[in-house]
Regions:
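Short, intrinsically disordered C-terminal tails of secreted or membrane-associated proteins
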Residues: 314-319
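Alpha-helical substrate-recognition element adjacent to the catalytic core
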Residues: 1-131, 228-230
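C-terminal cap/substrate-recognition subdomain and adjoining C-terminal extension
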Residues: 77-100, 104-301
Length: 320
């Protein structure tokens, strides 16, 4: 839940797709058509198409190229500041909040975004690399159903992707490090539905977000409320100003009518005009972790007025 949840569009559209001379529509059509023709998983076929396209254009899918691309990912409004605010809100009440990523995007890109240090663990697709550091095969493919395995890993405190034994061992509910009832899952659409339903049905909360700059983007999420798959629907604007103006009210649960064209976010103008990346670039220095001074803002009236934080706290964290 990174693309469309914390950042608009798909991360492959920033640098890779323009670099191979394809439009966003062409690349995703080819990948999905391959999946249909071969009756294959769409995540695996998009990863395979990346390798095929790079080879055909003489590009090198180096880890460093993905990392460089991650440093240029554009986030939704307020995302950078969100973590400090919600962490401070929890700390003021003796609650430690942990953040995880569970995404069908590329881990190599996500791990170099400016908010990567905020996450305890990033579960996402990744490649195997040869001795020269060039991607040659998918290592992890995270689709809409196997995303749920990572929810169980988080629940049981299993952080390794490789480990398949501990996650299947029986652990009493009250002894699990992260109980389902304490989980809040934030996602943007169909690839998150199984996880949203799992978390909600297990006593946690699921929140669906949409790109506020895409017309009628909210409408296709109304069915999630109707079908009792999510607890809350709101725009993907994490800024404090937005919250204070009331955009994250409980009223946002109420349904509208109509529909939204599928894949609207995929062709978002936010990602269509990026410059192609040279896939032989060198890695840049890593980001320093931000020091969060939670004590100074525990009693901040702006935080107390933050409607979305209040929603999460009053409807979830208080009901354990």
């Amino acid at each position: 839940h990174f693309d469309g949840t914390l950042a608009p569009g798909n991360m492959q559209e920033y640098d890779f797709i323009p670099a191979v001379g394809k439009s966003n529509k062409e690349f995703w059509h080819d990948a999905n058509q391959l999946a249909e023709e071969q009756d294959a998983d769409m995540v695996l076929t998009y990863m395979a198409r990346m390798i095929q396209e790079a080879r055909s254009k003489g590009l090198s899918l180096r880890r460093e190229a993905f990392q460089e691309s991650g440093r240029r990912v554009t986030l939704y409004k307020g995302v950078r500041e969100w973590f400090a605010r919600i962490n401070a809100y929890g700390a003021a009440r003796g609650i430690r909040i942990l953040h995880y990523i569970n995404s069908s995007g590329l881990k190599e890109i996500i791990a170099e975004t400016e908010i990567a240090h905020e996450f305890r663990r990033i579960y996402a697709c990744s490649f195997l690399y040869d001795i020269d550091g060039v991607a040659y095969w998918p290592a992890v493919a995270v689709n809409y159903t196997n995303k749920t395995q990572f929810i169980f890993k988080i629940n049981k405190g299993v952080e390794s992707v490789f480990d398949s034994k501990l996650v299947n061992q029986y652990i009493e509910e009250d002894k699990r490090p992260v109980p389902f009832r304490r989980m809040i899952y934030v996602g943007d659409g169909t690839t998150d539905i199984p996880c949203m339903r799992l978390v909600k049905n297990s006593g946690g909360h699921s929140i669906a977000v949409y790109n506020p700059e895409i017309r009628n983007a909210r409408r296709e999420l109304n069915g999630l409320i109707r079908d009792n798959r999510v607890s809350h629907v709101c725009p993907a604007d994490y800024s404090d100003r937005r919250f204070r103006n009331g955009y994250a009210r409980q009223d946002d649960h109420r349904q509208d009518r109509g529909g939204s064209p599928a894949g609207a976010a995929r062709n978002s103008p936010h990602v269509a005009q990026r410059n192609p990346l040279r896939f032989d670039g060198k890695p840049s220095p890593g980001f320093r972790k931000n020091t969060q001074h939670t004590q100074a803002i525990r009693n901040d009236p702006e935080i107390r007025r933050n409607r979305t934080i209040r929603y999460v706290y009053e409807n979830h964290l208080c009901n354990q």
